[in-house]
């Protein structure tokens, strides 16, 4: 029997330090995964501290609920349900929010999840296997134009149209139902290859992001987090590809600038609205040692912002 897939938490010490944890504070881990960040946060909290950990993956929630720590509340929901779940728990504000974005190693390494072209498995890709369409189900009905749009917008795939046509041609002879089948279709349709990268990498990324609505979830949770952060509370986001990082970077940049007002408004400087966030340091990437030990960390980017007293 093979060992269970292991998840190596990226930027573990750096992310926990960036949260500037108050021992008695309330914190949110937006993606519990296998609990690396959550355990490190709990280690910094005293008996009055509290951690709310979200995850869409039922298996991640099983791991979280098995931890014998009364300070931890595990929530089986996407992090876009942030405000709703805080209301349910009777929490108005929190002291820090950590978002470790993207897919976890166990999800990639467990063949049955259908997220990787390294295995032959049902073409699923859902983070929450208890709800929603699988990629195979979506591909069965999607038009060439729809498939092209997803591959282009979420995978930045140059050969999106050629791949979409190849998928449509292949499904005429039967459903595109397995990861290997899809990978072979893409491999034949891609005319040039990027060094060190499988031709299906961008397509698999695009379909996974789309089927899980990852970018939409991120765009929803960022403003919700700022609304609920106490002044001085930190928002820490770790992204793993340019699409995620672009959203985080733009949001933090925009929220760290004063609101745009008509220039002729009769307001004194002290009366002008203040920005809601203050950027903390520069973006941070894993060091050479971490990348050598965990090659999947190489694309990670961490950004940090602190809630000001600016009006919500």
Curated annotation (Swiss-Prot):
Coiled coil: none annotated. It comes from the Bacteria. The keyword rRNA processing applies. Keywords: Cytoplasm, Methyltransferase, rRNA processing, S-adenosyl-L-methionine, Transferase. GO terms for biological process: rRNA base methylation. Pfam families: Methyltransf_5. One of its GO terms (molecular function) is rRNA (cytosine-N4-)-methyltransferase activity. Signal peptide: none annotated. S-adenosyl-L-methionine binds at residues 35-37, 55, 79, 100, 107. SUPFAM superfamilies: Putative methyltransferase TM0872, insert domain, S-adenosyl-L-methionine-dependent methyltransferases. It catalyses: cytidine(1402) in 16S rRNA + S-adenosyl-L-methionine = N(4)-methylcytidine(1402) in 16S rRNA + S-adenosyl-L-homocysteine + H(+). GO terms for cellular component: cytoplasm. It is found in: Cytoplasm. Its main location: cytoplasm. Its EC number is 2.1.1.199. Residues 279-312 are annotated as: Disordered. Belongs to the methyltransferase superfamily. RsmH family. HAMAP family: 16SrRNA_methyltr_H. Specifically methylates the N4 position of cytidine in position 1402 (C1402) of 16S rRNA. This is Ribosomal RNA small subunit methyltransferase H. The lineage of its organism: Bacteria, Pseudomonadati, Pseudomonadota, Betaproteobacteria, Rhodocyclales. The gene is rsmH.
